[in-house]
Every structure is written in C-alpha cells, then in structure tokens.
From Swiss-Prot:
The record marks 190 as: Stabilizes free radical intermediate. InterPro entries: D1/D2, Photo_II_D1/D2_sf, Photo_RC_L/M, Photo_RC_L/M_CS, PSII_D1. Its EC number is 1.10.3.9. It is found in: Cellular thylakoid membrane. This is Photosystem II protein D1.
C-alpha cells in the first residue's frame, strides 16, 4: 500500500476574498458591484431614517424661512420628508466638511445630498450586480435592462431635474406629501400632463398593470389540474417540473375568441418579452420627458383660448390645466417671489368685475 502526500496549494487572502465575492454558491450573491452597493445603500438608508425622524428645519428656498420635515418637528408619516438642500447651496457639492459646522450643514439641507448621492450610486451598482450575476449564471442580460427603467426615473427626478433647474432645492423631497408637492409644482411649471412622453409613460404603467392582470388571470384559469377538488391547485406544481403547468392553447383560444384571434399570443416567449418591454419602454419615455423638461422643454401649451363669434371663451381642458397650473404656481414658494412668470405682464391688467 502506497500513500502519496501532496503539498496543498497556498491561496492568498486576496484570492480567497475574490472567490467569495464572485461565488454563486453564496446565499446572497455579493459581486464586485455589491462591494460598492452595500455600503452606499446602508449609508443612504441610515441617513434617511435619522433625518426623517430628527433633522432640524431646512432653509429650502434660501430666504431664511426654514421648512420642518422630520417627525420630531411636528410631522407625521404622511407629511414628513427629508427636505431638499437649500437654494443658497444651488448645485454645489455640499458634504459635511464643506460646512462651517454641523448645525450649518443641517440648516442647509446637507442630509438630502448625502442620501440621494449614495442612493443613486447604490441603485446603479444594484443594476450592475444584476448583470454580473446573470453573466456568472450564463443567463441573458435582460433583467438589468428592465431594472434600468426605475433607475432612469430616479436619476431624472433626483439628479437631472435639479441640474437643469440650477439647484438641488428643486429635487424631489424624500417623503409622501413631498412627492405630491413635487408633482403639483412640476405640472404648474412644465405642464407635464400635456407632454407626449408623460402620456407614453402613463400608457406603459397602466398598460403594464392591465397586461399583468390579464396574463395572471388567464394562466390561473387554464391550469392543468393535478389535484382533487378539495385540494389547492397550487399543490399540483412541483418546483423544477418539466411539464407545462398551464394550457397555453386553451388560454390562447379563450382570449382569441374574447377579442379577436391575433390579439392573443401563441408564443410564450414573445408574450413574456412583451409583458416586460411594455412598461419598461413607457417608464424610459417618462424619464426622458422629465429630463427634457428639466431644461424647460415643456409640454404643449394652449395659452390661447378658443373664442366664439362674440369673443366669449369656450372652455376646454387646456384652459382648466392652465388655470390650475397658475394657481399652484402662485402657492409654490409664495414668499420667495411676488408673482410667477406666467402672471408677470408689461401691461397693467384690471381686476375682474364681480357681479354682486
């Protein structure tokens, strides 16, 4: 009997780390993008939670009128927000070391920049990590392509729009009511409801919801029965089974008769590509719309009302939007300027006569 002793190959600590980072056997895949994603998202989340709970008021308009957004300063979950950095800061990069003190940094809304920059880097890395894991597993790269839609939307409202408007104070506040306020002001200043790219985005989101519900209900209604009537149909599926779990021919026949033949897919791969592509392309268009409106390439304006033969205004939906936009613009930053640009006029306008 012969015993052979072989010297074990020594692996450096760096090589062990590389193998661990790129291993697909880990419970959660880390990846090289993950080494940057994890600290940035943890930093953004931690700062957001602390600022949402305890941040002092922020001078968002740069006119020495601070706006409180945290829970400890009188807000609730709905009204609370991380308030954007001050208009006095503009587009300047404003880390903690750029301020004279921590109090000054908080007063000028420094936490907002800290959160959004780390958040954006984190979601960019998350998208890269999706590609990286797909590559390691030999999969196609479409998962990260689909994820690029919400990434582009977040980049548009947190980075591109403030750059176009000249100040991070115009970025979207990090809160529920702050998001709604951002939407109202965006409509008032850019007429986004009349922008074709926004319309395509609405079609993408609502259409995607409709198609998802239609697909799920069709599949659920055409499952191949593998159980008795007293058992859940979910028990009829075994993870990894080779057999089809639903009858696509039956679903195709039902939907083709419900509408017409060519409205129904007879190819499962083409169907699922369509379900993925429709909302993604719609959200891409919305992000492009916000990015173009950031530089004031706004939605359609129908400022000239339709008049009848006597000169009376015939009200249209465009008139409703214009009037609502002016009203919202008047209420926005009401102490930062006297009148919105839409109301500024070289000629004096007499007040309307009130019929008493």
């Amino acid at each position: 009997m012969t015993t052979t002793l072989q010297q074990r190959e020594s692996v450096s600590l760096w090589e062990q780390f590389c193998q661990w980072v790129t291993s697909t056997n880990n419970r959660i895949y880390v990846g090289w993008f993950g080494t940057l994603m994890i600290p940035t998202l943890l930093t953004a989340t931690t700062c957001f939670i602390i600022a949402f709970i305890a941040a002092p008021p922020v001078d968002i308009d740069g006119i020495r009128e601070p706006v409180a957004g945290s829970l400890l300063y009188g807000n609730n979950i709905v009204s609370g927000a991380v308030v954007p950095s001050s208009n006095a800061i503009g587009l300047h990069f404003y880390p903690i070391w750029e301020a004279a003190s921590l109090d000054e940094w908080l007063y000028n809304g420094g936490p907002y920049q800290l959160v959004i920059f780390h958040f954006l880097i984190g979601i960019f890395c998350y998208m890269g990590r999706q590609w990286e894991l797909s590559y390691r597993l030999g999969m196609r790269p479409w998962i990260c392509v689909a994820y690029s839609a919400p990434v582009s939307a977040a980049t548009a409202v947190f980075l591109i729009y403030p750059i176009g408007q000249g100040s991070f104070s115009d970025g979207m506040p990090l809160g529920i009511s702050g998001t709604f306020n951002f939407m109202f002001v965006f409509q008032a200043e850019h007429n986004i409801l009349m922008h074709p790219f926004h319309m395509l985005g609405v079609a993408g989101v609502f259409g995607g919801s409709l198609f998802s519900a239609m697909h799920g209900s069709l599949v659920t209604s055409s499952l191949v029965r593998e159980t008795t009537e007293i058992e859940s149909q979910n028990y009829g599926y075994k993870f990894g089974q080779e057999e089809e779990t639903y009858n696509i021919v039956a679903a195709h026949g039902y939907f083709g008769r419900l509408i017409f033949q060519y409205a129904s897919f007879n190819n499962s791969r083409a169907l699922h590509f369509f379900l993925g592509a429709w909302p993604v392309i719609g959200i891409w268009f919305t992000a492009m719309g916000v990015s173009t409106m950031a530089f004031n390439l706004n939605g359609f304006n129908f400022n000239q009302s339709i008049l009848d033969s006597q000169g009376r205004v015939i009200g249209t939906w465009a008139d409703v939007l214009n009037r609502a936009g002016i009203g919202m613009e008047v209420m926005h930053e009401r102490n930062a300027h006297n009148f919105p640009l839409d109301l500024a006029s070289a000629e004096p306008v007499s007040a309307p006569v009130i019929n008493g």
